[in-house]
């Protein structure tokens, strides 16, 4: 039926990508008109460890996902053409002239460090299993170059196992899925406050009586009344009241601009297919309640990659570099976002946040000084926020004195009992 329905074709494929021994048996059957043609098939050595980054091709080697899709034109090359003379059986008997030369595909050097990629994959998979979580992502960036050294997601897929493909697993959650970041956004609220010139790390904020009223109603509260605390302690203790008071004291346009400069609500320009820009609403639409809730990570949304790039700004002494999935020959030009003074003040504050007095102490690493911030957010659902569905986040960098790596960990809907960012995401870091 396939042959008779395509009479204009010289041949039709009966089956492709057969194992050689199966093809040999088909030829041995001696059926007239049956022939074989050798084809090449992509093999991905890293398998599911790098599946979301590398992606895969279809049976004709056309990129369908990941770098295979984004750089298909680069990898593919061009088929040449020549004018020939054929006999009545269609066989080439003479080459007449070359019409267009062929061009081989070019080499593409991904930025991934497979050692870090494997470790990130292993630790994320363990965290998802241990915490009975729905999904998760880890992104690791090179502070000096903006290169993506690791990007892993769970659940994942193996591009070599086509029979087991599940389309729901293809999505690179680290660049496509947006989420409300919870308290992991607080460092950027504090950075805006310091840049305004109205606050310093030692400035005192009164968080009494432990909750905050806006518009006549309580919108947030801390785990306990922290009283008068400095800005450093706001981050270390993750005070919602303190962060909200800082945000409310800043001009709306200034606060929006500050967050936008960090990359919130903007594409990272990674070039990865399906990347989301996140959400940062126009400040003209803000109300006091919304401005306050921004300070502890509600009312705006980010991707894991965006959040990692934002933390990289603080790690890089206040400059923002474009992220790259491709290896760069030399560090790209950087854009200054905050002053060196502000960035270094944040480094010290974030180091306090992972100290024994902070919420992120489980992110500490022996023999290394690390800095970072936890985040825990209720997930939105039908009718409002669900009180039993959480997102756990940790963003940080190391070593503090001269940061080399930035990492963001996101664990979606942990259901193993623990759900705070400090308990679920920080240990992965």
Task: Pin down the residues of each PLM region.
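Short, small/polar residue-rich loop motifs at catalytic or cofactor-binding pockets
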Residues: 79, 132-135, 206
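Small/polar-residue-rich segments within soluble enzyme cores
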Residues: 2-105, 408-409
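Short, charged, low-complexity patches
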Residues: 64, 68, 113, 117, ...
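Flexible, solvent-exposed loop/hinge segments and secondary-structure transition points
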Residues: 30-31, 61, 116, 124-145, ...
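Conserved, well-ordered alpha-helix/loop/beta-strand core segments that scaffold catalytic motifs
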Residues: 10-11, 93-136
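Beta-lactam-recognizing serine transpeptidase/beta-lactamase-like catalytic domain environment
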Residues: 86-99, 112, 138, 142-183, ...
């Amino acid at each position: 039926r396939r042959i008779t329905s395509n009479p204009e074709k010289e041949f039709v494929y009966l089956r492709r990508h057969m194992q050689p021994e199966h093809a040999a048996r088909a030829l041995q059957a001696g059926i007239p008109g049956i022939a074989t043609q050798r084809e090449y098939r992509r093999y991905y050595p890293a398998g599911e460890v790098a599946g979301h980054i590398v992606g895969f091709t279809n049976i004709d080697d056309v990129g369908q996902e990941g770098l295979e899709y984004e750089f298909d034109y680069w990898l593919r090359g061009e088929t040449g053409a020549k004018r020939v003379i054929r006999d009545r059986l269609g066989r080439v008997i003479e080459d007449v002239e070359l019409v267009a030369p062929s061009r081989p595909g070019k080499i593409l050097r991904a930025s991934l460090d497979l050692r870090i990629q494997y470790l990130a994959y292993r630790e994320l998979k363990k965290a998802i299993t241990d915490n009975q979580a729905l999904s998760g992502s880890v992104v690791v960036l090179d502070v000096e170059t903006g290169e993506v050294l690791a990007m892993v997601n769970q659940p994942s897929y193996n591009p070599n196992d086509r029979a087991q493909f599940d389309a729901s697993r293809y999505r690179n959650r680290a660049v496509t899925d947006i989420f409300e970041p919870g308290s992991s956004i607080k460092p950027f609220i504090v950075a805006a406050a310091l840049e305004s010139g109205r606050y310093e790390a030692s400035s005192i904020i009164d968080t009494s009586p432990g909750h905050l009223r806006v518009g006549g109603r309580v919108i947030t509260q801390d785990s306990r009344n922290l009283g008068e605390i400095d800005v450093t302690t706001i981050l270390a203790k993750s005070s919602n009241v303190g962060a909200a008071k800082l945000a409310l004291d800043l001009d709306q346009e200034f606060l929006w601009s500050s967050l936008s400069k960090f990359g919130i609500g903007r594409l990272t320009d990674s070039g990865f297919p399906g990347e989301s820009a996140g959400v940062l609403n126009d400040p003209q639409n803000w109300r006091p309640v919304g401005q306050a809730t921004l300070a502890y990570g509600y009312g705006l949304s980010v991707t894991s990659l965006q959040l990692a790039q934002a933390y990289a700004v603080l790690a890089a002494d206040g400059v923002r570099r474009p992220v790259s999935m491709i290896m760069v020959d030399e560090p790209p030009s950087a854009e200054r976002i905050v002053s060196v003074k502000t960035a270094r003040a944040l480094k010290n504050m974030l180091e306090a946040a992972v100290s024994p007095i902070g919420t992120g102490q489980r992110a500490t690493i022996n023999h290394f000084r690390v800095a970072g911030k936890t985040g825990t957010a209720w997930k939105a659902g039908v009718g409002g926020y669900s009180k039993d569905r959480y997102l756990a986040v940790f963003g940080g960098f190391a070593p503090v004195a001269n940061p080399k790596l930035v990492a963001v960990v996101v664990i979606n809907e942990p259901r193993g009992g623990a759900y705070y960012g400090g308990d679920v995401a920080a240990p992965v870091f």
